[in-house]
Amino acid sequence: MSTLGRYRHVVKLGEGTYGMVYKGTEIQTGRVVAFKRMVVTSDDEGIPGAAIREICLLKELRHNNVVELFEVLFDPPKITMIFELCDCDLKRYMESRPQRLLDANTEMRPILKQIFLGLEYLHGRCVVHRDMKPQNIFVNVRGPDFAAMTALPSSPQQSMRVPHAGGTNGEAGRASANGNEHAPRPTAAEGSVSPWEEAANTKDAPNQLIIKIGDFGLARVEEIPVKKYSHEVVTLWYRSPDVLMSSALYSYPVDIWSMGAIFFEMATSKVLFSGRNEDEQLLRMFWLLGSPTKETWPSMMTYTGTMERLERSSRAAAERQDLTVNGDVYVQQQQLQAQQQQPQQGSSPSHSSSRAPDLLTQLAHKRFYHSESAMQQRRESASSAANSYRLPVELWFDRPLFKEYMAATRCDVSVSPEGIDLLRRCLMYEPNQRITAAEAVHHPYLERVPVPTAGSLDVLISSLMQTMETIHLL
């Protein structure tokens, strides 16, 4: 079946991982949708495996906080998946807020709880998302009237639906220049403010935020046996340490680690681990959380890529150490690079964490590299029994920077001690020691947070608002 003659006001939103994504209005119903179109060429061996996985998964998923797939159209050589269009993705929503910071009670906690509710549903059905990041989480913004009507305590039995989205999967985790593939991004030339942005910036009363998890192109069903999972999953900044070690059998905890990184980003507007490559990413984890031991990460040596990754990260750390005979030198270099990377006036700002001086690097070099005595202390500690894995001194950091970094970024002020506890439980080295999605929903930081329950009503309102916007009534 073809989309020809079924849609009007068709606009290209961007290019997803496996095809083009468009926005259009159904002529018969007036419903505004996003549709992802893939073309299978004669050179292909068939429909891409990721597309098959996404179609199969989405056809079975029905939940308030998980994208709904409306329809799949087959018109050889094209395959078109029809989704509901959301207002924006979480990354863009955060960028729209003052100083890119979210209010803890009216924004951050409700968003966080709904994401965990979505993950609880997915994990309960043996689905591992494998690419959790702000670009794959979607937001519908509803005004105070809608909020007052629908804000009720959450129930474990929720059965709604909505959006889909994507973004790119670049190595450093940067957003695609095209923006999100199912959330429209007005160009500067349009110069208009969308209805959701007006609602988001109202000061009269809190809005209702409805959150959806999307983009299941990398998802896996846990019960289906496979020879080995690819470790090239989860955009680098949100990738768990076990995936960095090339774990072949990772499961639900990879999503939980990503949630810890997303949580921190919502609280501070900064990326938690902004490594330029996998070796630097692991080093930053060791700085923040302390180097792993047999107690904190008992399964570390069971992963196929552990030894190679440790060797590579050790070399990267040694290069940094050579630069810091005087510990201030490296920090000064970092600050100079940050100033040089500042966007020119009139250009689009990049992520705040990529422009601001790297606080984690500054703290690490002040504690671990600043003086010969600091490095000598590390050498002595690395030779002690505490270093149960006998890690090289370049990778041995026995005094975690977690507490200092939470204070330096004001994360501890933004989220309270209970929030810090939830964050830390997401960021455990050992996968089985991480909090589960079901446990997170009932964590003291989230347990009493109300979430929207008017699922089908939101679908109707979302479609109506987007249709009116399309025909310039809003």
Swiss-Prot record:
Catalytically driven reaction(s): L-seryl-[protein] + ATP = O-phospho-L-seryl-[protein] + ADP + H(+); L-threonyl-[protein] + ATP = O-phospho-L-threonyl-[protein] + ADP + H(+); [DNA-directed RNA polymerase] + ATP = phospho-[DNA-directed RNA polymerase] + ADP + H(+)
Entry annotation: catalytic residues: 131 (proton acceptor)
Biased composition (Low complexity): 334-354
GO biological process: cell division
Predominant location: cytoplasm
SUPFAM superfamilies (UniProt xref): Protein kinase-like (PK-like)
EC top class, as a word: transferase
Localization of this protein: Cytoplasm
Modification Phosphotyrosine, positions: 18
Enzyme Commission (EC) number: 2.7.11.22, 2.7.11.23
Segments for region (Disordered): 150-200, 334-356
UniProt activity-regulation remark: Phosphorylation at Thr-17 or Tyr-18 inactivates the enzyme, while phosphorylation at Ser-230 activates it.
Residues that hold ATP according to the record: 13-21, 36
Modified residues (Phosphoserine): 230
InterPro entries with a match to the protein in the record: CDK, Kinase-like_dom_sf, Prot_kinase_dom, Protein_kinase_ATP_BS, Ser/Thr_kinase_AS
Positions of the Protein kinase domain: 7-446
Modified residues (Phosphothreonine): 17
GO cellular-component term (any): cytoplasm
Keyword annotations from UniProtKB, A to Z: ATP-binding, Cell cycle, Cell division, Cytoplasm, Kinase, Magnesium, Metal-binding, Mitosis, Nucleotide-binding, Phosphoprotein, Serine/threonine-protein kinase, Transferase
Cofactors named for this entry: Mg(2+)
Subunit structure: May form a complex composed of at least the catalytic subunit CRK2 and a cyclin.
Purpose: Serine/threonine-protein kinase. Involved in the control of the cell cycle. Required for entry into S-phase and mitosis. Probable component of the kinase complex that phosphorylates the repetitive C-terminus of RNA polymerase II.
Stated name of the protein: Cyclin-dependent kinase 2 homolog
